Amino acid sequence: MAPAEARGALPGWISVLGWGLALCSLCGAGPLWSGSHEWKKLILTQHWPPTVCKEVNSCQDSLDYWTIHGLWPDRAEDCNQSWHFNLDEIKDLLRDMKIYWPDVIHRSSNRSQFWKHEWVKHGTCAAQVDALNSEKKYFGKSLDLYKQIDLNSVLQKFGIKPSINYYQLADFKDALTRIYGVVPKIQCLMPEQGESVQTVGQIELCFTKEDLHLRNCTEPGEQLSSRQEAWLAMEASTHGMMVCEDGPIFYPPPTKTQH
């Protein structure tokens, strides 16, 4: 179940290497898309811990609610590597950070390394916007958007709960579009050898740069340059995810270690 504090906030409305890179703090390769670090939208990315754990095959217990992966400006990364992460800047947010933005793979280690990675790679670019121009603002606003979206409760409202039975991708799409009024991006782990169905792992909802209002993640007729397409392809492969295909989809229940 989702933590109680995250409910009721809606106003009406994922290879081992891949995930290791996505959640590490020592990723040295720079992005293909650098340019002037300009970006057009923010992507609030939430992932399903049981799927993350399935991919890396290293978690003992998985959380049973969607958690934050990051708040990412599209097309821009590592905008200011001299702007170092300082845990003291977000000490007032730590309680919520530990609940809603955990490192789901390395839960018993220094979880702040995950936050450091997200700040250096994404937060320093998001800081172009006044509402996100400090560590505290970036992480605080990310938490606010997470609670506002309240993905856990929305899926449950439509009867979409972790199950050994399969859903259709359309079940997820229809529920999210109906509540949020925008087109999200739903990402899956593709079936491995011996498997017959994709596994949902990540959901992205996008926001405008100017006022942080919900918007479609992809607009009809939107054209990307070959460089931007290469950047997006690299991002997807790094996270071990691909856009889900139409058809059946597995929403895996959490796993618990027998003690």
From Swiss-Prot:
Gene Ontology BP annotations: innate immune response; RNA catabolic process
Lineage: Eukaryota, Metazoa, Chordata, Craniata, Vertebrata
Role of this protein: Ribonuclease that plays an essential role in innate immune response by recognizing and degrading RNAs from microbial pathogens that are subsequently sensed by TLR8. Cleaves preferentially single-stranded RNA molecules between purine and uridine residues, which critically contributes to the supply of catabolic uridine and the generation of purine-2',3'-cyclophosphate-terminated oligoribonucleotides. In turn, RNase T2 degradation products promote the RNA-dependent activation of TLR8.
SUPFAM superfamilies documented for this protein: Ribonuclease Rh-like
Disulfide bridge positions per record: 53-59, 79-125, 188-244, 206-217
CDD domains assigned to the protein according to its UniProt record, in alphabetical order: RNase_T2_euk
Residue numbers annotated as active site: 69, 118, 122
Domain of life the protein comes from: Eukaryota
Enzyme class: lyase
Record keywords: Disulfide bond, Endonuclease, Endoplasmic reticulum, Glycoprotein, Hydrolase, Immunity, Innate immunity, Lyase, Lysosome, Mitochondrion, Nuclease, Secreted, Signal
Stored InterPro entries: Ribonuclease_T2_eukaryotic, RNase_T2-like, RNase_T2-like_sf, RNase_T2_His_AS_1, RNase_T2_His_AS_2
Gene name linked to the record: Rnaset2a
Name of a matching Pfam family: Ribonuclease_T2
EC number: 4.6.1.19
Record-level Gene Ontology MF annotations: ribonuclease T2 activity; RNA binding
Family under the similarity heading: Belongs to the RNase T2 family.
Name used for this protein in its record: Ribonuclease T2-A
